Design a protein with these regions (language model features):
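Conserved N-terminal segment of class I S-adenosyl-L-methionine
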Residues: 1-90, 104-107, 139, 160, ...
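A short SAM/SAH-binding and catalytic strip from SAM-dependent methyltransferases
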Residues: 90-101
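A short glycine-rich, Lys/Arg-flanked "PGG" loop and its adjoining helix->strand segment in the class I
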Residues: 104-116
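Conserved beta-strand signature within the Rossmann-like core of class I S-adenosyl-L-methionine
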Residues: 115-123
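Acceptor-substrate binding/catalytic loop of class I
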Residues: 129-147
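A SAM-dependent methyltransferase catalytic signature shared across enzymes that methylate proteins
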Residues: 145-162
């Protein structure tokens, strides 16, 4: 049984930040880019119509078998043009697998696909990773920083523990008993959700509609 105090103190995850956007009531359609065979968006169905996009047919087929999404698109987001927009577009653990120039192109494309919100999660700075599970696409090719997202109008939060005690694939950086327990304590002490400079992962969120007018909403005469 989960410890209630631990649950209360638990820092928010990428899934929590996604739920926060859905809770606004403004998200009726959502696109998960690089969806693979599972998705954080599934929990919001049926109130949110979800679409999974992946370049790999095997991933799409397995996602269909599992009933992960309402709709599916097999496409390469960097080369195929999509004639659709969505209230929310998510990218979980995707952009770091691309070279930097391709990642910047991806952000440009994603910002055209979203009518309201974008949410992405990626490691903070470059974190080496090889072709895990025999999949060359699991290799990391770029690292991303807070100022790169903030410069594009994103709000950035931290997740997944601290960058000081987390390492390869977010596992313990050091081989001593209790490393991850110590990381949990340090995560709370450093308040990584609000201070992403300490975090292992970054969650970047953007409202593509920009900041609404606060004073003069009517056109000038």
């Amino acid at each position: 049984m989960p410890n209630p105090l631990r649950q209360l103190l638990r820092p928010r995850s990428a899934a929590d930040f996604t739920a926060q956007l859905v809770a606004t009531g403004e998200v009726k359609t959502a696109l998960d880019i690089g969806c693979g065979t599972r998705s954080h968006l599934s929990q919001f169905r049926p109130s949110v119509q979800t679409t999974g996009l992946d370049a790999h047919a095997d991933a799409i087929d397995l996602a269909k078998q599992r009933g992960v999404h309402d709709h599916y698109i097999q496409a390469d987001i960097l080369s195929d043009n999509l004639d659709a927009t969505f209230d929310l577009v998510t990218l979980f653990g995707l952009i770091e697998h691309l070279p930097k120039a391709s990642g910047l192109d991806l952000l440009d494309r994603v910002e055209r696909l979203s009518a309201k919100f974008i949410l992405l999660e990626t490691p903070h700075s470059f974190v080496p990773q090889g072709p895990e599970f025999g999949n060359e696409f699991q290799r990391h090719h770029s690292g991303w920083f807070i100022n790169e997202f903030e410069g594009r109008g994103y709000t950035v939060h931290g997740t997944t523990g601290t960058r000081y005690l987390r390492g390869y694939m977010a596992g313990p950086r050091y081989n001593f008993p209790g490393c991850l327990l110590l990381d949990e304590a340090l995560t709370l002490l450093l308040r990584i959700n609000r201070k992403p400079k300490h975090a292992f992962n970054l969650v970047a969120i953007k409202d593509v509609r920009g900041v609404p007018a606060r004073h003069k909403k009517e056109a000038q005469p």
